[in-house]
Amino acid sequence: MEIEVVLGIGEDAGPKPCSAEIESAEKTLKDDGVVQENGVRVSDNGEKKSDVVVDVDEKNEKNLNESGVIEDCVMNGVSSLLKLKEDVEEEEEEEEEEEEEEEDGEDEEEEEEEEEEEEEEEHGYCVGDFVWGKIKNHPWWPGQIYDPSDASDLALKIKQKGKLLVACFGDGTFAWCGASQLKPFAESFKECSKVSNSRSFLGAVEEAVEEIGRHIERVLVCDCAEEKKHEFDSPLVNNAGIKEGVLVRDVRREMISSLLIGKHGEILKDVKSFAETVSFSGLLELEILKRKVSAFYRSNRGYGLTEYHEPQSVPGLEDKNNDDDDDDEEKNVNDGLQWRAKRSRVEEVAALDHEESSSLQRSLEKCSGFPDHRLPHRRKEKSITEIIEKESAAKVRFETEPADGDVKSNVKSGRKKTKRHDEVNGDLENVTTTALWRRRKSEVATIEDGGNKQVVESSKGKTSRKKKKMDVDDGDDDGSGDKEESEEKEISDLEINIDSTSLASLRKKVRFDDSVVERSTENGETATQTSKRERKKSKYLSPDFLSDFSRKGRKKSTIESESSKVSSQSQVDERVTDASDSLMEVEEDTLDKPCEPSSDNGLGQEELSRELSNAVDFLRLGATPKEMQDLIRVAALGTQYPKDSSSRDMVREFMTIYRSFTYHDGANHKFLGSYDSSDKEKEELSEMGKPVTKGKEKKDKKGKAKQKAEEIEVTGKEENETDKHGKMKKERKRKKSESKKEGGEGEETQKEANESTKKERKRKKSESKKQSDGEEETQKEPSESTKKERKRKNPESKKKAEAVEEEETRKESVESTKKERKRKKPKHDEEEVPNETEKPEKKKKKKREGKSKKKETETEFSGAELYVTFGPGSSLPKKEDLIEIYEKFGALDKERTDTVDNNFSAHVAFLDVADGEKAFESSLEKCPFTSNSTVKFRLKYPNERTEEKKTEAEVAETTMEVEYLKKKLDEMKLLLDGCEGGMTEEVKVKLEGEMVNLLEKVIEMRSS
């Protein structure tokens, strides 16, 4: 307990303390002091003190000794001194602790630096190295190592101890990677550069390769010329993991020198090989070579290689439809960068939802500081080249002027795609109208008729409401004027680029629309009106895709049209007397009019000429003949055809039309008659276009049974006829090709021959089965009277009927031959036609006979053959060497003389047997070949050749069978060895089965 007393200035005495106060003072000084006579003593505590304190203590002791009473002021001074002492001690202790902490921190930093250096020595990666980094759920990505001191605030937040800061190329992201997640860039380039084909990955690889090339060229140039160092100053880093203002780290010189290993002469050699082959093994190899050449140019002439810069977009021409998408992307860029920066942390990526992660990944594709043309989601901008192309294409336009001045032609650009929701009959229909659909519906076709042009206007694509209104007002005369006004407003001209569309599409756009109908009003005016919209059909069913300008397509169209005519005529039983009425006659004087195409192919030819006229009309309107000539010349002279596929298609179609009309039906048709169509095609055309004749009608009146029986007998006898009859039949078939010029002559014989050939082709069974089937059918069809009569007949009556029918057929054939002799055809025509109209069975027989004759001629060889067999591993002589060695013995068959690499053998064919024997004897005496292994000689005679072939085949069969038996015995032996004394039931059953099979095989061999 302390008592404070305030003394006034100049007071000599104060209140004297009581005994209690003296006792308290003695207690405070008990620990350090010594009690004297008066009871109070203060001593030093052993620490260094000041002189003031000592003097005060001495004075206090003196006062105490003198007076023996301690005053309050003295007590206060003692207490303050004690407190001051304690404060000084505490400050000294704190300073000592701070010094110790600083020393510990310095030691820790030194330890960390030492650890980092040890880690770098362990994994071998340094700051500035190019590496491939692998993060989970991402491919190997190119990047560069940076110092942790260069890390941004975002990177420091997710810093991980013992990992390296890697700044990724391309997308501007970063990652903290361990040594196990990294690979050297150059050593692993071939492996890691092919892990993905995405656009972002390829862009990152290209950027990394360019950066390495910059460092390589910098090292090469700076070594040669120090004054050019400023040209290769390091740029600023633009990455989310690196703070602003940091320059790109320099690469170690050891790494660059490892890429530049090689002799000086190899650079020139590599440049020559690249120039000749235009191929390189990798992108890095090409970049290194390019930088070497660029450094060489900089050292000699002061500047490097010419650089190619990709075309930049014109600002202000963005696609406005994608503005909203771009705004959303800009909002999510910051969040996306953070997410991509934290992609090394698997836990945070897994915590994100699927929708959030997908949206972030989509927004991350755009990073600041990188060109927009490398981003997958960028604004659609028009380049300067596209604008120039459109301006040049806009010069060629398809414009139509109004005939009476009523319709105004206005050139309009393609409008945007719009969606309208219209209500028709209470139902909502979503109609999506595009610019292409509007063009098709707003076609304006010009039709030339006698030199006067009539403009037929088709209304533009209307909505369903307008169509409904027009349908309702069809019967009203008052509404016609309103419709005309609305139609005049909606009609617009077409703007067509000739060079960007093919000939088929251009012809389709000019074609007259069948849905347009002209309607006349009371005032005499005409109004165009479109019919109701039909269901949309596939474009591949349109005549543009179905029409074929080739010879085969025209033949099919004519056959189809004529076959439909014949079928309709046969159903209605119309009587057509002349064949010239169904088919157009071919004019004989085609040379007098070479420009007019002949129309011998009927309606198909008319359609083709209409198609050609449309195409030529359009070419006259759009592409000039000069332009077409230039395109054809470029296609003929150019080593590589231009990449414009539209002009290529147009040239191809024009040339097909031109060639078909020149060589098929044009001026050269008379000279190239054989190229036009073969005789077989003419026969098919004549068969399809042949009308029904009177003779056929007479036969139809007879009974069906008799007709079928005659057909069967005729077909059966035609096969067994002599050569004379075969010639007659051939002459009958030749007559069919001339049916166009001679109307009704010999039609009955031709029809019978056609029917017989058809029956023979369809007939797959034998003649006996067909005759039995025909007899059964004939027994069912005739009436009861005919059945009774046939039962009465005996076999002799059947023979008589057959003889009568044979006489009739012979008479018909004789008449046909007489008529054909009058015509007097050239001999070569007579020979060609029968060969084409022969029966397929006879053709097959002739082919087989020809093949057998060829084989006989090939195998026929009267000389001897010397076979030389070499040991395995020896080199075989060439054919020329064999001929030189054995030609001195006699004449050789050089075609048969050859070496066989598979068998290590060679055979020499001598035309004379005696020469072969001489060569064989001399070869046995002295071998003409120099080889390490043994050489065997064998002579074959002509009569032994077939016998030896048979024996060789038999020997091969026997060896195969013996090998099979040996194999089976080995399998059985293995089964027994595997049993080891104890045989299971399964093994026993299997062994019995093998033995049974083996015995059966032995029995078969013995019997054979």
From Swiss-Prot:
Residues 127-188 form the PWWP domain. Disruption phenotype: Delayed flowering associated with reduced H3K27me3 level on FLC. The triple mutant pdp1 pdp2 pdp3 has increased levels of FLC, MAF4 and MAF5 expression, but decreased expression of FT. A motif (Nuclear localization signal 2) lies at residues 809-816. It is found in: Nucleus. A motif (Nuclear localization signal 1) lies at residues 786-793. InterPro entries: PDP_family_Arabidopsis (IPR052657), PWWP_dom (IPR000313). SUPFAM superfamilies: Tudor/PWWP/MBT. It holds the Pfam family PWWP. It comes from the Eukaryota. One of its GO terms (biological process) is regulation of photoperiodism, flowering. Residues 87-122, 321-330, 473-490 have a biased composition (Acidic residues). Residues 84-124, 307-339, 399-606, 668-874 are annotated as: Disordered. One of its GO terms (cellular component) is plasmodesma. Residues 399-409, 511-522, 677-687, 707-725, 739-758, 768-787, 794-818 have a biased composition (Basic and acidic residues). Together with PDP1, PDP2 and PDP6, interacts with MSI4/FVE and MSI5 to suppress FLC, MAF4 and MAF5 expression by regulating the function of the PRC2 complex and modulating H3K27me3 level, thereby promoting flowering. Belongs to the PDP family. This is PWWP domain-containing protein 3.
